[in-house]
């Protein structure tokens, strides 16, 4: 099974969000709006992306 690589960009601010959502952003390596990281599509990462999907733009590489 191959693991997909995803490009994740934070498009909205984390100000005023739940602490658990801020923790998910930190876990993904995102710090501020318009910051982009490339992550592997493991089940753990996909769960974090799902939880804060309203703050992100996700592209498959």
Curated annotation (Swiss-Prot):
Lipid biosynthesis as UniProt keyword: no
Gene Ontology BP annotations: translation
Coiled coil: none
SUPFAM superfamilies from the UniProt entry: Ribosomal protein L30p/L7e
GO cellular component, one term: cytosolic large ribosomal subunit
Entry keyword Ribonucleoprotein: yes
Highest rank taxon of the organism: Bacteria
Keywords carried by this UniProt record: Ribonucleoprotein, Ribosomal protein
Family annotation (InterPro entries): Ribo_uL30_ferredoxin-like_sf, Ribosomal_uL30_bac-type, Ribosomal_uL30_ferredoxin-like
Family, similarity comment: Belongs to the universal ribosomal protein uL30 family.
Designated name of the protein: Large ribosomal subunit protein uL30
